């Protein structure tokens, strides 16, 4: 490309909030990229980037309010960590006393549809301290075991029924900007580079990719330790003789380690045997395993990979490779050391890594963990939850981290957490909301992520309808619509 042609291309890209070098490097195109290479493919009122639990609920909530909504995802199904990542079960949706379901709305609809299709056990029937919660004795009351394959179908059905347009195999590349206002996004699809023009955008990528690219400030992990929580590659097994496994665990329950009054440490006695034989080198001393819908099926949350940066392809590749190595070690462990696990079969490993922490996008308000501990319900509450503060050790080895069931019955999550600083026309939702590292450790799990997604979709719809900004939208209107959509608030 001649210098004059390059400058002309760079000027075109600059008008869209892009620069040619950054776009070229993002997409793997050579230096012959022209404006015509970016197809002006879609025009929509709302663009939701990321089809995980939070993005799905954002899209459904907005579409039900009559907003033309496009939901894009880099994969070939909806559900993110719950489907592609095989993460399960859904953590608690009840208050801390275990008496009342408080995360309702779209989350409850999803659960009910799963149960109707034989794809879940209802949380009202699941108690903590049992095989459904890895025998963890607190903070896990009323979890929801589910089948990830049925969950894919339920999410897709609910989106299509609401009128959401879904676009799979569409990876976010760049934000389209006009000053501080986001106007859409460039996607990389099998068709090439495609531009989506949108009146509003919701970042549900988990890693805050859209907000960060648009110029919103953020921190990566915990600013004090300069680390992120470790990642895990989940996997599922079947052909387990669950009766024999349970019979091995129950007599050892009094030996379980107690932290902040919480009893956990499943199969630590079997891990000790494997370690003594030189057949265990994982950075854990016990096994987190959750019985699933079918009696012989279990979800394993035990692999541990430290210092994973999911925004770096090489780093993430190394983590995924190490995760699969650890899965092989764990399968050997089940076959050789766990009663009932001798004939266990590997059903599948997550096609994406279970990432606990990466970017925290910053808003004018950053939710502190102390507000959760104190049970604060803010004036602009959009979701009530009681999920425990669960910060996995980032330092390496089995030690470290923080697990603390909340001392109040519930806490409230404010609308302000969904509003990024310095960027207009954008909401954030899911794991990347404006919260400190420890607070994010509580609300990163799927039920609150779904509730926050529903709130962000409602807020975005109101901003579009009323032609206002995220910071000026009337909270009274948000609350009214949340209540209309069966969200529990007090």
Model-based region annotation:
Residues 58-67:
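A short, Lys/Arg-enriched amphipathic alpha-helix followed by its capping loop at the start of a domain
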Residues 5-28:
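N-terminal export signals
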Residues 53, 60, 171, 198:
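Mobile, glycine-rich extracellular loop/lid and propeptide segments
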Residues 42, 49-54, 64, 72-77, ...:
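Active-site-adjacent structural elements in enzyme catalytic domains
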Residues 68, 74-174, 178, 229:
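Conserved N-terminal/central alpha/beta ligand/cofactor-binding core
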Residues 106, 125, 137-138, 145-146, ...:
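Flavin (FAD/FMN)-binding glycine-rich loop and adjacent Rossmann-like elements that form
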Residues 22-53, 63-64:
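C-terminal segment of N-terminal export signals and the immediately downstream linker at the start
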